[in-house]
Amino acid sequence: MNVLIIGVGLIGGSFALALRDRGLAERIEGVEASEEHARRALERGLVDRIVTLEEGLPSADLIVLATPVDTIPLLTVKILNRIAPHQVVMDTGSIKGELCEVVAMHARRGRFVATHPMWGTEYSGPDAASRGAFAGRTAVICERERSDRDAVETVERLYGALGMPLVSMEPEEHDLHTAYVSHISHITSFALALTVLEKEREEQHIFDLAGGGFESTVRPVSYTHLTL
């Protein structure tokens, strides 16, 4: 199987490592907007080569979207516009409601499988990618009945080979539960950072004086797009 990973960062890079370690892909190519991330992805051997979307799409059996969650809906539509009938598209984003609405009426909706592997850290980029990240973690599939059977089976086999239990949910149910178990911690971090910065205008001084506990607590503020 030839795999194209769009966004070779924490999730995309870890996914690539998992595919390699289990011999699930003959070739892994990556699409990466950041030149530095592209360089590191190649240096770490996460992908065989970095390509443009136009270069990578035709030969890919599976296309994995692992870009920031706010970019996934329109990117999914763009990819569905270009794929062949045999290709499978899946995403790894943590918000499903908007995405499933955007692709609902697309002529190739059946080739898309909306998924969310329930794993992540506060770090990002290809250097944050780690081996064994997904084993034992739950993978959620949303609107499986809207996807073609062979597309769902491809994704289920893949997640199964990575040692991930599968759960089916509707998008709204997924987003509600994810908000409780994941996004609330990001909101709390954001509120803490705003409170401290309201009192301390010199942001760098805060991190110079504060210990590692404070820094690790407010680091998820980079995820504020999840709450907007």
Where are these regions (language model features)?
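NAD(P)+-binding Rossmann beta1-loop-alpha1 motif at the extreme N-terminus of oxidoreductases
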Residues: 1-53
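Rossmann-like NAD(P)-binding element
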Residues: 55-83, 87
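Glycine-rich, N-terminal phosphate-binding loop of Rossmann-like dinucleotide-binding domains
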Residues: 67, 93, 143
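Rossmann-like NAD(P)(H) cofactor-binding subdomain of soluble oxidoreductases
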Residues: 77-127
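Active-site capping/gating segments
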Residues: 113-141, 146-147
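Internal alpha-helical scaffold of NAD(P)-dependent oxidoreductase catalytic cores
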Residues: 133-220
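Conserved small/polar residues in nucleotide/adenosyl-binding loops
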Residues: 224-228
